[in-house]
Curated annotation (Swiss-Prot):
Residues 33-48 have a biased composition (Basic and acidic residues). GO terms for molecular function: amino acid:sodium symporter activity; D-amino acid transmembrane transporter activity; L-amino acid transmembrane transporter activity; neutral L-amino acid transmembrane transporter activity. Unusual broad substrate spectrum amino acid:sodium cotransporter that promotes absorption of the D isomers of essential amino acids. Neutral amino acids are the preferred substrates, especially methionine and phenylalanine. Keywords: Amino-acid transport, Glycoprotein, Ion transport, Membrane, Sodium, Sodium transport, Symport, Transmembrane, Transmembrane helix, Transport. Belongs to the sodium:neurotransmitter symporter (SNF) (TC 2.A.22) family. It is a multi-pass membrane protein. This is Sodium-dependent nutrient amino acid transporter 1. Residues 1-51 are cytoplasmic.
Amino acid sequence: MELKTMPHNGANGSPQHNNNNNSNNNNNVSSDTKTDNNEKEAQKKDEGRTNWSNGIEFLMSCISVSVGLGNVWRFPFTAYENGGGAFLIPYIIVLFLIGKPMYYLEMIIGQFTSQGTVKIWSICPSFVGVGYGQAFATICIITYYSSLLALTLYYLFVSFQSELPWSYCRDEWTNCVNSIPTEFVETALGNTTSALAQQANTLSNTTKLQSSSELYFLNVVIKEKSDISDGIGIPDWKLTIALFVSWVVIFLVIMRGVKSSGKAAYFLALFPYVVLFALLGRAVTLEGAVDGIIFFLQPQWGELLNPIVWKEAVVQCFFSLAVGCGPIIMFASYNRFDHGIYRDAMIVTTLDTLTSLLGGITIFAILGNLAHNLKAENIRDVVRSGTGLAFISYPDAISKFQAVPQLFSVLFFFMLFVLGIGSIVALQSTIVTIICDQFKSWKYWKVALATSACGFLMGLVYVTPGGQWILTLVDFYGGTYVVFILAIFELSGIVWIYGLQNFCDDIEFMSNKNVSMYWRLCWSFFTPVMMIVIFIYSMATIQPIKYSDQYFPLAGDVAGWLLFAVGAAQFPLWGWWYIATHRHGSCAESIKASLKPSSKWGPASPENRQAWLLFKSDLAAKRANEAKSNKFGFFQQKLRNMCGK
């Protein structure tokens, strides 16, 4: 939607008359000399906050974190589990009514305050638990994302072998079908194709066939356990080394902060598309690929009434855009105050969706070919859903490249590693920033080192034979639902408690543009109501989670709910803590005061802050005069505000 230019602001986003009332504005900031000095000292620190070298670096950084594993890894298997093409319709609807509004809101709040995901809650201090709860969910996501990096690195290393190890069957895999093309098998392995084909035909009548890429992943790489009732096993030493190397890379990138990440973002954001388009070009030429693409794109209208599909669409949108976790707020906080983020928000959200569709079409083209090779009647039968999909179907496609598949495999898994690094660096930077904001004397690189070491230790649980079970559990309880409920509190705290009009006034001051009706309606009604309805219904109809069509043991479900409780409890616990430590008369008065912006709320720069206070004061006086001059002025003003006029 268009944003209309406001005539009363300067080009830099500050009012043109901001220099006439400096002494009055200083008195408005604080009436206490000591408090005023403390705020000035804090403002000096914030004024010296590092900015991006240019706007393109910020845009590329947002692309690198939003266009990542969520698109190439999570979106295909989420669509796979929710009816293929049926998932696209709710996903696109959710994108426009929830994803884009939330993404734009987080960009705005970060740039306006120049603060991280916890410090922004000076807007509504008793909601500070939202920031800490999101940090908890971010830690959960980081731990299992890093295990995916370990798997990616493992595949990258073995891709240097003379023959891709997942492209052929082992003798002990009696239900195996080679992932490598038949004609290439004849060339590389001799005249054994007819015997293998005869064996496959015989087995297909009695046993479910599995591709060699799937069996390699399950039996060789993760050594998956079919049941975790007796424990998850011990970490695999090869994956442990890969996990350690991954965290070393993460630390080396993160220890320098955002100063150098903007330069790396060009490569992190653009390189993956080269490999993705090449893989797509190969995938669509495979036999059966059209059937897979049709399955992906053909909508099943009945699924639109399934609230679980809508819930998964919201969760996928959040994971894909990195909404509700903090990186977008953190990145935007390093922008100049007058940076035009509207364009960036639209570019990133649109590109993110197109990348998800690109990844989905590619993976389903491969699944269609797998179904053709395994003589499966239904594409859903060719491979199990779950986190292993990207490590089964993508390698299967790579093995079909007859011209130097090893080279393409190296490029692909390096691309996947780059995508993962881009995502985790942003998430990890969010955690390090939160800690450094609370303990300003701590060295950034030391905090980065400590958090990286903790991330490695926590990631060890995912490289055990039962690691994929734990990943599913943590993703569901520690990531999905915690992010979901805290995003509802985030939006309600900003739009309903602080107030839609107050928030839109702040946007107008910062951007020198009016906020259109689309954003106002989404923020005030459509986005929060949809999220609340979907969350309540999904919780009321929640079913015990499964992995590989098997239910978790009771202990697993209990652990999962405890994980969710810890994340969700951050909101009320920190709210109670703030109210208890900031008493203002009675309990009711203290609660009411905790819902009002603190003296720290507003732009970090002293000049922008003074201009903002004057801007808000002028608007309040103008609206009061309009309400007095017209009997229905109050209601007319409310209507104009909602319409963005």
